[in-house]
Design a protein with these regions (language model features):
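Active-site core segments that coordinate phosphate-bearing ligands/cofactors
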Residues: 1-171, 176-218
């Protein structure tokens, strides 16, 4: 065996995430924010998980901090299935972009896919709030869903910052919800981090890691 890694450290390596303050993120059915910490630390409430990153050594502290949000792409898919079944995901993004920032008061809490670690394993469910029958339409719901997911990400990222992580850059694959300009712009604006998209996946990283581990490449 020349290389081994869990799915998220492996994904982070495929996205060139090695240094403190760098973040690897995915936004599929569930969403992940995986950041690199340069000092040994942990969250006392275990809302995020800490373990050795792929480039950790006894002389170099590189720890991966993992946040998982269960209600990410599954919320977007639920909205598509139940609110906008007649349009594509790309058209959903256009609908969302037609609504002002903040969805004119509509708020969606995206925790509807089971217990959330970031909430200390509470199962609070998803909720939609602030709908005015005289003002709001489905475009507001589409946008509020994406905004709610972003703020759930940022809630977890604040925990990482409390652990000493200076979040500067988010790396993500060019796929799933990161295909939405609105999602990307909102996440960048709220988190204050830049976002870089990569045409890659974890399988490519595993192959490269195995070759490096075998000593074929240095």
């Amino acid at each position: 065996i020349s290389y081994r890694a869990g799915d998220q450290p492996n994904n982070a390596v495929s996205l060139n995430v090695f240094n403190p303050g760098e973040i690897a993120s995915t936004a599929g059915t569930s969403g992940v924010v995986y950041g690199v910490l340069g000092d040994v630390n942990y969250d006392p409430k275990s809302r995020v998980n800490t373990f050795a990153h792929a480039n950790y050594t006894t002389d170099l502290d590189r720890l991966g901090v993992l946040l998982c949000i269960n209600g990410t792409g599954i919320l977007n898919a639920w909205v598509h299935r139940n609110v906008t079944p007649d349009v594509s995901y790309a058209d959903m993004n256009d609908l969302a972009a037609s609504v002002p920032i903040g969805s004119e008061g509509v708020k969606i809490i995206p925790f509807g896919n089971g217990a959330e670690r970031v909430l200390q394993n509470q199962e609070v469910g998803c909720s939609i709030r602030g709908i005015n029958f005289n003002k709001h339409n489905r475009a507001h719901i589409v946008r509020a869903a994406q905004e709610g997911i972003v703020f759930s990400f940022c809630y977890g990222m604040e925990i990482m910052q409390q652990m000493g992580m200076d979040i500067k850059k988010i790396h993500a694959g060019k796929a799933t919800m990161f295909l939405s300009p609105l999602f990307r712009d909102t996440l960048a604006g709220v988190s204050g981090a830049t976002i870089e998209l990569y045409e890659t996946d974890g399988s490519a990283c595993a192959a490269k890691g195995a070759v490096i581990g075998a000593g074929i490449y240095k």
